[in-house]
A protein has these predicted regions:
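N-terminal Sec-pathway targeting helices
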Residues: 2-19
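Intrinsically disordered, low-complexity, compositionally biased regions/tails
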Residues: 10-11, 22, 150, 271
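Hydrophobic alpha-helical membrane-insertion segments, chiefly the h-region
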Residues: 19-29
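Interaction/scaffold regions that mediate signaling and macromolecular assembly across diverse proteins
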Residues: 28-117, 121-289
Length: 289
């Protein structure tokens, strides 16, 4: 009887050990499987499966509707009209915000930069519309948290501000001074929002055009040969280090784009002219105002 009971106890012990082992193994696989699912959720982009519209066709349609020429070299934005196109803006915003960092990292440099410029400019419109009507973008926010520090959109899964795109990504990743004439600040003193969205295939040409257009607009930049002065936008003061990465002086960079003869005699003399920074007009670039 004792041997029988002993055998039963031994069998029960083996059964308990087996059940414990099975339970532990099951928990292990659940955790592993769960971890794999979490990894997939965090980065569900698979290389070679990029479905992003790099022509930005929806955004281009919006730009066609709201960007209005105000001078031969300048344009404004019809913010009231843009505000009315809520569904279009929601779709554009959703397309930009759903891009993951893994997907972004799989793109070419030109695709990345075109995306960031377009995202910055579109989100600038969104910021103005959120607070519209305003007299200036600088009226948005507080003394301590200005418009460019307002966290109001999602990028790569986190809530971001405009400064993150410009300083945390574009200026950090790309040594490209011409971006300062592609990024807009919703003000009359800043470069105009172009009628054509930025695309990878034409990016160099588009950046050149935007730079040349702004530098040749005498409302922002001009040469005073009589006074031997070169009047430049304050953009050149704020981002002087960026421009000097590829030029010996601010004069050299500016004159390269100010006209076909700016670096030829007698224009070449302007290389030695004193730089004077023009007043910056922070009034909203609204065609309604």
């Amino acid at each position: 009887m004792r041997s029988f009971l002993g055998g039963m106890r031994f069998s029960v012990l083996l059964l308990v050990i087996g059940l414990v082992s099975l339970t532990a193994l099951t928990i292990f696989w659940i955790r592993v499987d769960g971890a794999n699912k979490e990894d997939t959720a965090i980065s569900d982009f698979q290389p070679g499966q990029d479905d992003f519209d790099h022509t930005f066709s929806r955004y281009q349609m919006l730009v066609n509707t709201v960007v209005v020429p105000v001078s031969p070299l300048g344009a404004g934005v019809h913010y009231k009209r843009a505000k009315e196109l809520r569904k279009d803006r929601e779709e554009i915003r959703a397309n930009l915000e759903r891009v993951s960092r893994a997907q972004f990292d799989s793109w070419s440099n030109n695709q990345q930069l075109a995306f960031l410029i377009n995202a910055y400019n579109f989100m600038t419109i969104e910021l103005v519309i959120k607070h519209y009507p305003v007299r200036s973008i600088k009226d948005i926010g507080t003394f301590f948290v200005g418009p460019w520090k307002q966290k109001f959109f999602t990028l790569f899964g986190d809530v971001r501000d405009l400064d993150f795109i410009e300083h945390g990504l574009i200026r950090e990743m790309f040594l490209e001074p011409r971006i300062h004439f592609a990024l807009v600040c919703a003000s009359r003193g800043c470069p105009s929002l172009q009628k054509e969205v930025y695309v990878a295939e034409k990016l160099d040409e588009q950046l050149d055009f935007a730079t040349r257009q702004f530098l040749q607009d005498k409302a922002h930049n001009r040469i005073d040969h009589e006074g031997k002065k070169l009047f430049l936008s304050k953009i050149f003061s704020w981002y002087e280090d960026d421009f000097l990465l590829f030029s010996d002086s601010l004069q050299e960079f500016a004159l390269r784009y100010m006209g076909d003869n700016s670096l030829k005699s007698p224009g070449a003399a302007a290389l030695n002219y004193r730089v004077v920074y023009s007043d910056y007009d922070w009034a909203l670039n609204d065609v309604q105002q």
